[in-house]
Amino acid sequence: MDKLLINGGISLNGEIRISGAKNAALPILAATLLASEPVKICNIPHLHDITTTMELLGRMGAQLMVDEHLNIEVDTRNLKEFYAPYELVKTMRASILVLGPLLARYGRADVSLPGGCAIGSRPVNLHIHGLQAMGATITVEEGYICARSQGRLRGTRLFMDRVSVTGTENLMMAATLAEGTTFIENAAREPEVVDLAHCLNQMGARISGMGSDTLVIEGVDSLGGASHTVLPDRIETGTYLVAGALTGGRVKLKNTSPGSLEAVLLKLEEAGAEINTGKDWIVLDMKGRRPRAVDIRTAPYPAFPTDMQAQFTTLNIVAEGSGTITETVFENRFMHVQELQRMGAVIRLEGNTAFTNGVETLTGAPVMATDLRASASLVLAGLVAKGVTAVDRIYHVDRGYECIEEKLQQLGAKIRRVSSYTPGKIYAAYG
């Protein structure tokens, strides 16, 4: 099993290019199931979850082609299967996004209850209840969601009991081919939801209200082909900005979208970073200074993103002063704390809040990732720690970060991927 070895204590400097957003690319891949013509997707990140989704589409009978620029064209005109098997779905939560498109276009779908990161309950009830309100018959049998529709789904008014990104996306996709108009209230406002809506509209859908908490979808008879460029990954952007901040460095990130990161940029400035932005770039400069601790409270967009909580936990544990980090979106999302404590972090957990007291130095140690963003926080800790940190189970980080070690190397980090190591001899890795 691969690991990352990191020799910390180096100030990061340089520039890198940000990849396309995984959380936009995955629903857009699912949306190709709605199209009666091929759909081309550009700026798609090459990650394990993307590969898994492509394999799932291929098993259903879709034809997928990758061009010389690594863009993907998906043709779902000759689908033969309407089934998402457990052996694929168990590895990622986003696989449930095929449920709405399959049901809307083909009138049937059998999708295994999904897996993904172990960060608490992410109930699928919002998806099921919404599709039932649109006329679907749904049962859960032996771990599978079995959905059927007699004819087209029906437009209706839906109210989301809580803000759900995948729930909003699934119901929005299903509504594009429904008969009549669908209103989704308390809809997610995330940029990735907006990007999916733009792609669907390019395919011929009639969606309005993107970026607000009420989406209006006028159903159409069919959707056609399109070419769509996936928006930049705001969470990858935020992660590398934190890397620059906690190492006292200066980093420039290109091919990104500053407007989607306002809450994160404000907190980085509060931590002492100097930030400049352009249309598609961000420069962060800490000028060799130690960051100041900040208080964070996660909430749905446009508030501070839950997917940046773990990274800011790492920032706080090496910052001047004390800070509090409150998680309101998911429960059980502080599993990185125990591993950070092994490196010398001073953190106290009380319910859904972490209280941090910054220390001047972390110590490198073998640590184990438990989920995608927790793994990123451990890599960040390794960058600033004294000595060598070995991060195990990095298949988690590979689910969301394209070429993470290569990009960090471009910024000057001493980091490399290994297939095995001897714990007592990890300091020889960079001898």
From Swiss-Prot:
Compartments, as annotated in UniProt: Cytoplasm
EC number: 2.5.1.7
CDD domains, sorted: UdpNAET
Record-listed 2-(S-cysteinyl)pyruvic acid O-phosphothioketal modification sites: C117
GO BP term (any one): cell division
This protein's pathway: Cell wall biogenesis; peptidoglycan biosynthesis
Domain of life, source organism: Bacteria
Assigned keywords, A-Z: Cell cycle, Cell division, Cell shape, Cell wall biogenesis/degradation, Cytoplasm, Peptidoglycan synthesis, Pyruvate, Transferase
GO cellular component: cytoplasm
Subcellular location, principal: cytoplasm
Active-site residues annotated for this sequence: C117 (proton donor)
Catalytic activity: phosphoenolpyruvate + UDP-N-acetyl-alpha-D-glucosamine = UDP-N-acetyl-3-O-(1-carboxyvinyl)-alpha-D-glucosamine + phosphate
Family statement drawn from the similarity comment of this UniProt entry: Belongs to the EPSP synthase family. MurA subfamily.
Name of the protein: UDP-N-acetylglucosamine 1-carboxyvinyltransferase
Organism: Nitrosococcus oceani (strain ATCC 19707 / BCRC 17464 / JCM 30415 / NCIMB 11848 / C-107)
